[in-house]
């Protein structure tokens, strides 16, 4: 071998590479066109395929030259050093930054704040407070070295059994849009981005990677896309995450009608779209995703880079589509802290953020019932029943979980306000919690990966009449906590999850009988991210407080409400039905099915099972209160409901047209004896038109400041004229019918305080004709 010749060849190659790197443009905000021209096809393909999530099941080896920048982060984009293109880091959310708390060879801890879940945040009906939470989460995202937080969850609560409802805000798109907008604005004010998810109609977790969500264009536009649209137009999120599921037969991540025609052309979106963490699909060509407008494949397979290169060379993929997506990626990258060289500290102000958590979780809690039981005064000792009193759940399972340094349970929260718990009962429960957690870890099904991400629900223990009789004389009152857990990859069941278990029902009845016999109060705390059945047992207790999954300060927040330190002002953002089957969507929803058993996995593969392979949205526009209110169906607690320790008086509302905007105003007075906040919910009843419409629909809302007794505040709420529109499928347009619109101000959807009328002229707005259904569905109608 001629070693001299070989050495000269290697040296020449190295010199050429160095010269090429030196002459190559270095990315900045003003030379993106130049950088794209300088990129090789392989480099362009690399930029469209993410990586870094080495622990993702089935993801295979990630792009080899990447390293982990932030341990536990969800993924990264690829660096191209030759062109000055850095990697960027994305972390899971949205209830806090999901990263590893401990790092090999590092004695420091990297715990993040566990903030209230999405449902709890939305139940504040306080966009200023939600924006403040977003700012805190954005700060932790920044200081822990991440560029994008994967959240917020913008999907609707189509059905109370959806396992991921805890991450989502509401059954209503307006609540979703306004709360989501505030959250995004807060996060992005810190110089980091969000990835609003899951776009779109990710309405169930069962078979979520391939279920076909079949629905009308009207329901799609008015309900499932409306919140996203509001958030995109008002907050400009850096990224949108496309959903796993199909929409009318087409995968969302390869749906050009969704990702380009609607998102970009109709709404004017300028950011990037990235896939949910699916990797490579066997039944969806990669070129279809790129062409559709999916800019980033996450978490990415090395083979996908070559797939893009081959598709361009074979004529299956237009290089113009590749360049378009590359441009969007570069426009995203130059905004990131990592590109700008931000020196993150790894030390956000967790103490300050805990205070924000406590404030927001307290304001999001909803008082469902209060028969002179709250606030508690003069209580020294309570009997604390229910496993979750001692293992209070701060958040849900899966990617939405947060690795936290502590979580305040009910025992600690009560102790902090000077209320003791009966010692023997406390010892029994605390010992059981230790045992049950150890057993759960030992017996864990290896397929149930999500149990390592979050706090699993422990089984309830039976409380005998003898036990209750022993505890009653030692306590001034009883508090029972009923807990529920759910999360990514699984939906809830009716029996034992939506409904009480027999053990739980027996506990409530036995405790109530014993304590009421002695004239003592019984208070129930619901520690759940989702709706539960209450109608069968609510008459047996004196007070019910929905604490949701309120973040790390949960026990303290509950104590703040119980003592009256904070007056409850939370309102339900979803209907609490009498039974789960009262929702018309339940007929088409997955139920009584366990995705983590091999038998069911085999059944699943058959490919045409209702509720699993496809879900027909036959309820159409009648989701949540739109159904119950229009069809006059009784509910346990209506949408928008929530009690206070004080009373409020609503003045006569007024409504005025101001150009393309409509201003609604109402004066609210605190007529009670303690300070409090109240929500004004603005519902609109439309005149009859070509399309059947719900009896009334929420269009906006406002919340007062803390009003002292006798104090008043005038709320002014603004909406656009186009917000009154229904979607006209026949003409692919939004249409406001001419006529008189009734603006109804309520404290909930059933409790209307005043009405004002506004005459509105016809208005239309053309849209793309996208995502039409491919099968005939039997839509629910009030008048057939």
Residue ranges and their predicted role:
Residues 21-726, 735-745, 749, 771-784:
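Glycoside hydrolase catalytic-domain context in secreted enzymes
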Residues 751-767:
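Short beta-strand elements
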């Amino acid at each position: 071998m001629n070693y001299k010749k070989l050495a000269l060849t290697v040296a020449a190659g190295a010199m050429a590479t160095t010269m090429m790197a030196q002459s190559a443009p270095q990315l900045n905000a003003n030379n993106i066109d130049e950088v794209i021209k300088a990129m090789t096809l392989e480099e362009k393909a690399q930029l469209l395929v993410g990586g870094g999530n080495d622990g993702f099941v089935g993801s295979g080896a990630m792009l080899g030259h990447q390293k982990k920048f932030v341990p536990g982060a969800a993924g990264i984009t690829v660096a191209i050093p030759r062109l000055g293109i850095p990697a960027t880091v994305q972390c899971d959310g949205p209830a806090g930054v999901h990263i590893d708390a401990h790092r090999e060879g590092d004695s420091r801890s990297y715990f993040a704040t566990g903030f209230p879940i999405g449902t709890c945040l939305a139940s504040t009906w306080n966009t200023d407070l939600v924006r403040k939470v977003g700012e805190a989460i954005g700060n932790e995202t920044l200081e822990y070295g991440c560029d994008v937080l994967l959240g917020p969850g913008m999907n609707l609560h189509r059905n109370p059994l959806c396992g991921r409802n805890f991450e989502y805000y509401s059954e209503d798109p307006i609540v979703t849009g306004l709360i989501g907008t505030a959250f995004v604005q807060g996060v992005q004010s810190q110089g980091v981005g969000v990835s609003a998810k899951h776009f779109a109609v990710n309405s169930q977790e069962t078979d979520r990677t391939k279920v076909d969500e079949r629905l009308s264009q009207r329901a799609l536009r008015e309900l499932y896309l409306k919140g996203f649209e509001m958030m995109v137009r008002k907050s400009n999120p850096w990224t949108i995450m496309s959903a796993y599921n199909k929409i009318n037969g087409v995968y969302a991540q390869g749906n050009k009608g969704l990702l380009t025609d609607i998102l970009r052309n109709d709404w004017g979106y300028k950011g990037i779209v990235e896939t949910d963490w699916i990797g490579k699909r066997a039944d969806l060509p990669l070129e279809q995703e790129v062409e559709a407008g999916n800019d980033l494949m996450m978490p990415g397979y090395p083979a996908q880079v070559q797939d893009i290169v081959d598709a361009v060379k074979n004529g299956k993929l237009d290089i113009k589509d590749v360049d378009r997506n590359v441009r969007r990626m570069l426009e995203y990258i130059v905004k990131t802290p990592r590109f700008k060289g931000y020196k993150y500290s790894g030390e956000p102000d967790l103490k300050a953020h805990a205070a924000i958590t406590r404030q927001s979780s307290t304001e999001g809690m909803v008082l469902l019932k209060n028969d002179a039981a709250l606030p508690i005064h003069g209580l020294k000792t309570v009997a604390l029943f229910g496993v979750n009193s001692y293992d209070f759940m701060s958040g849900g399972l899966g990617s939405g979980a947060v690795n936290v340094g502590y979580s305040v349970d009910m025992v600690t929260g009560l102790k902090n306000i000077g209320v003791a718990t009966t010692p023997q009962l406390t010892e029994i429960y605390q010992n059981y919690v230790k045992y049950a957690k150890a057993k759960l870890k030992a017996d864990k099904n290896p397929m149930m990966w999500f149990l390592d991400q979050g706090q699993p629900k422990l089984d309830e223990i039976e409380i005998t009449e003898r036990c209750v009789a022993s505890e009653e004389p030692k306590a001034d009152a009883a508090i029972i906590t009923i807990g529920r857990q759910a999360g990514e990859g699984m939906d809830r069941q009716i029996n034992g999850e939506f409904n009480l278990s027999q053990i739980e029902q027996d506990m409530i009845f036995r405790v109530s009988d014993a304590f009421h016999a002695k004239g003592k109060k019984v208070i129930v705390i619901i520690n759940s991210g989702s709706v539960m059945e209450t109608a069968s047992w609510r008459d047996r207790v004196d007070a019910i407080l929905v604490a949701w999954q309120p973040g790390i300060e949960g026990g303290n927040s509950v104590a703040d409400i119980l003592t009256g330190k904070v007056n409850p002002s939370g309102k339900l953002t979803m209907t609490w039905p009498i039974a789960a089957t009262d929702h018309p969507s339940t007929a088409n929803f997955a139920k009584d099915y366990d995705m983590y058993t091999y038998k069911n996995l085999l059944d699943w593969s058959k490919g045409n099972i209702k509720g699993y392979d496809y879900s027909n949205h036959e309820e159409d526009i009648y989701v949540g209160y739109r159904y119950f209110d229009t069809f006059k169906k009784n509910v346990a607690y209506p949408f928008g409901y929530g009690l206070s320790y004080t009373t409020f008086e609503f003045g006569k509302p007024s409504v005025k047209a101001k150009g393309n905007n409509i201003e609604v105003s109402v004066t609210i007075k605190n007529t009670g004896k303690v300070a409090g906040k109240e929500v004004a919910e603005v519902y609109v009843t439309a005149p009859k038109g070509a399309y059947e419409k719900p009896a009334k629909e929420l269009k906006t809302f406002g919340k007062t400041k803390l009003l002292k007794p006798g104090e008043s505040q005038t709320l002014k709420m603004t909406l656009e004229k186009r917000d009154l529109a229904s979607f006209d499928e026949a003409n692919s347009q939004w249409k406001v019918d001419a006529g008189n619109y009734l603006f109804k101000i309520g404290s909930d959807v059933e409790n209307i305080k005043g009405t004002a009328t506004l005459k509105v002229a016809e208005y239309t707005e053309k849209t793309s004709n996208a995502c039409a259904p491919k099968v005939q569905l039997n839509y629910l109608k009030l008048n057939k």
